[in-house]
Amino acid sequence: MHPPTDLPRWVYLPAIAGIVFVAMPLVAIAIRVDWPRFWALITTPSSQTALLLSVKTAAASTVLCVLLGVPMALVLARSRGRLVRSLRPLILLPLVLPPVVGGIALLYAFGRLGLIGRYLEAAGISIAFSTAAVVLAQTFVSLPYLVISLEGAARTAGADYEVVAATLGARPGTVWWRVTLPLLLPGVVSGSVLAFARSLGEFGATLTFAGSRQGVTRTLPLEIYLQRVTDPDAAVALSLLLVVVAALVVLGVGARTPIGTDTR
């Protein structure tokens, strides 16, 4: 590969302005934190309950994203049918939908009178405004992140090896477990981390579809929203906690995908 050419100097000015624009609000949060009380603010019973619920539901939604997203990414990447190509925008739509719209859509799908929810309700299964609703809301908004991060790798990774394995007599299931999945594993890990981070910070769809019941559906973003009115210092401290978690996630993903690495 040829080394990149030097950029014009004027390019650095808007680049620096963009960096400052992104960094300034984060720095403002750190400055605003009541540091002597920081640990006490993030370890109150309500904060701990919300954090634990967020981690549990984000982990559950990440598992769902992997179970659903890996096959979806493979189908999108490998299938050449028109139907699959036409479904791609639909699958990625939650990326651009306002989260509150996603929450309303889930409510009318899985709510008591929803398209599917009415039958579940008749069977004694209630999803809306429960912990399961939190998991579904997080999965709805996070699934496209895993799919889109894995689709590119699924399109090229291991195709030649799969053909060789098949010509040697390996069954499709064996090819999947022994060839395809190991080659996709780095992408699955990166996509899972992104999905977990997105689930951890989900707010709008959760509030609309699951509500804000303490210990049941009140995740950390909802706790921050409520504390913003009753205890602004606690809201700032919890916000910084989420910023740190998100930063660790971004650094972790960046460490797994070094710049200039050829992933083919």
UniProtKB/Swiss-Prot annotation:
Listed CDD domains: TM_PBP2
Transmembrane stretches, start-end: 11-31, 57-77, 90-110, 127-147, 176-196, 234-254
Membrane topology classification: Multi-pass membrane protein
Classification via SUPFAM superfamilies: MetI-like (SSF161098)
Keywords attached to this entry: Cell membrane, Membrane, Molybdenum, Transmembrane, Transmembrane helix, Transport
Gene Ontology MF, one: molybdate ion transmembrane transporter activity
Iron-sulfur listed as a keyword: no
Subcellular location: Cell membrane
Transport found in the keyword field: yes
InterPro entries with a match to the protein in the record: MetI-like, MetI-like_sf, ModB_ABC, NifC_ABC_porter
Entry-linked Gene3D superfamilies: MetI-like (1.10.3720.10)
Any one GO cellular component localisation term in the record: plasma membrane
Residues covered by the ABC transmembrane type-1 domain: 51-253
Family classification: Belongs to the binding-protein-dependent transport system permease family. CysTW subfamily.
Biological role stated in the UniProt entry: Part of the binding-protein-dependent transport system ModABCD for molybdenum; probably responsible for the translocation of the substrate across the membrane.
Protein name as catalogued: Molybdenum transport system permease protein ModB
